[in-house]
UniProtKB/Swiss-Prot annotation:
GO terms for cellular component: cytoplasm. It catalyses: UDP-N-acetyl-alpha-D-muramoyl-L-alanine + D-glutamate + ATP = UDP-N-acetyl-alpha-D-muramoyl-L-alanyl-D-glutamate + ADP + phosphate + H(+). It comes from Lactococcus lactis subsp. cremoris (strain SK11). InterPro entries: Mur-like_cat_sf, Mur_ligase_C, Mur_ligase_C_dom_sf, Mur_ligase_cen, MurD. GO terms for molecular function: ATP binding; UDP-N-acetylmuramoylalanine-D-glutamate ligase activity. GO terms for biological process: cell division; cell wall organization; peptidoglycan biosynthetic process; regulation of cell shape. The keyword RNA-binding does not apply. The lineage of its organism: Bacteria, Bacillati, Bacillota, Bacilli, Lactobacillales. Its EC number is 6.3.2.9. Keywords: ATP-binding, Cell cycle, Cell division, Cell shape, Cell wall biogenesis/degradation, Cytoplasm, Ligase, Nucleotide-binding, Peptidoglycan synthesis. Its main location: cytoplasm. This is UDP-N-acetylmuramoylalanine--D-glutamate ligase. It is found in: Cytoplasm. ATP binds at residues 119-125.
């Protein structure tokens, strides 16, 4: 961690805990700040607040008292999940108190260079691939950010010889100021989080902030398969490298089934361990970032031919009596399920789908389901999905949840079939998180092996 004194004796409010808020509070406390933490969860149920109190940090829990901001704070570190129209945030901004997120703090304390990855889909897989490749190459890469490892906590421990490989959400990027990654990567840009940002333009503007402090000495990696991303190349001061499955570009690309970086042959596209065009894009993006950090081809090939996927993200679980089973519980929207389906032969595929009903239809999914062998539906959207399947003459069965769906569909399947959980819906009708949904599916798989 850098030896910085700017926070010493400064009164700082950390708004919202969870892991990132707790990490920020501990880092700031170590840097000599006078830290106050405010979180809405009652103290008795708030493990993070209890730990911080033991560290001598002032904690205020159970509500967000607006008069707390009368204490003349020099800075607010906001949990990224808290919206900017929150009364506490609005009051802080009215008082000219700077509001940042924890990734800005991570940048300020980090001695290590940062690879920042953002975008709508593919962030976690691409982030993990990059870190795995660099580590396979003998380098020291540290996963951090929106991937489950608080950025400031990892940055605090990182050395100058490490590389921070940081997954970044639009929520996190809205709260940066001086944040400047050495390499930034935008996987793609689609419609998402409009309930938070208010518009697609605001969402994309938040993502675009990843490069706002970069110079020509830094690198921005863009997806030239997407025209929207291609047009961004002229709007940055950073040096742009691209990836594409459709044409030769300045970074990584595919030509006649072969993957190249610039003019250098890397490997056959067919050797990739993960199925689907979207995972080919993820692999190309990871190759560009890894090559920019000096990774050798051997490390790239080793990882890309053996990578089993990130948990709950088109994760290959194994076989049950000759049937392959995949867990894609992270597919919480139609687009994610469309991308998953693109990697399989529909004629041998059974799709397990359903979940929270957000009021939308599934018409956009119909073309992707042509010739599907069968479906199992569950959750609030079960009836909508069943009607769609019947319209397309797809055999369809209803089940209570993901665990029963797998058990009940097995007698309908044949050797050589593939079973894919890719719900196309959020999990909150039956589960707290998509992780819980996926874990129960994994448990069902293990019980049937």
């Amino acid at each position: 961690m850098k030896k910085i004194t700017k926070f010493k004796d400064q009164k700082i409010l950390v708004l919202g805990l969870a892991r990132s808020g707790m990490a920020a509070a501990l880092v700031l406390n170590e840097l000599g700040a006078i830290v106050t933490v405010n979180d809405g969860k009652p103290f008795e149920e708030n493990k993070e607040a209890q730990v911080l109190l033991e560290e001598g940090i002032k904690v205020i829990t159970g509500s967000h008292p607006i008069d707390l901001l009368d204490e003349d704070f020099a800075l607010m570190v906001k949990n990224p999940g808290i919206r900017y129209d929150n009364p506490m945030v609005e009051r802080a901004e009215a008082l000219k108190i700077p509001v940042i997120t924890e990734v800005e703090l991570a940048y300020l304390v980090s001695e290590a260079p940062i690879i920042g990855i953002t975008g709508t889909n593919g962030k976690t897989t691409t982030t993990t691939l990059i870190a795995d490749i660099l580590n396979a190459d003998g380098q020291s890469a540290k996963l951090s950010g929106n991937i489950g490892f608080p950025a400031s906590e990892v940055a605090q421990k990182a050395q100058a010889t490490d590389t921070l490989v940081m997954e970044l959400s639009s929520f996190q990027l809205m709260g940066i100021d001086t944040f400047r990654p050495k390499i930034a990567l935008i996987t793609n840009l689609f419609s998402a989080h409009l309930d938070y940002h208010g518009s697609q333009e605001a969402y994309e503007a938040a993502k675009w902030r990843i490069q706002e402090n970069m110079t020509a000495d830094d690198f921005l990696i863009l997806n030239f398969n997407q025209e929207k991303c291609r047009k961004l190349a002229d709007k940055t001061k950073a040096t742009v490298l691209a990836f594409s499955t459709k044409e030769k570009v300045s970074g990584a690309y595919v030509n006649e089934g072969k993957i190249y970086f610039k003019d250098e042959f890397i490997m056959e596209a067919s050797e990739l361990s993960l199925p689907g065009d979207h995972n080919l894009e993820n692999a190309l993006a990871a190759i560009v970032a890894s090559k920019l950090r000096g990774a050798e081809n051997e490390a790239i090939i080793e990882v890309l031919t053996s990578f089993a996927g990130v948990k709950h993200r088109l994760q290959y679980l194994g076989e049950i009596d000759g049937r392959k089973v995949y867990n894609d519980s992270k597919a919480t929207n139609i687009l994610a399920t469309q991308k998953a389906l693109s990697g399989f032969d529909n004629s041998k595929l059974w799709l397990l789908a359903g979940g929270l009903d957000r009021g939308n239809g599934f018409e956009d999914l119909e073309k992707d389901l042509e010739d599907l062998k069968g479906m199992v539906v569950f959750g609030q959207t079960a009836d909508k999905l069943r009607l769609m399947a019947e319209k397309l003459n797809i055999p369809v069965f209803a089940s209570q949840n993901v665990a029963t769906a797998l058990k009940e569909i097995m007698p309908q399947t044949q050797v050589g079939d593939t079973i894919l959980l890719s719900p196309a819906c959020a999990s909150w009708d039956q589960y707290k998180t998509f992780e819980e949904r996926g874990d129960l599916f994994i448990e069902a798989f293990e019980s049937l092996k």
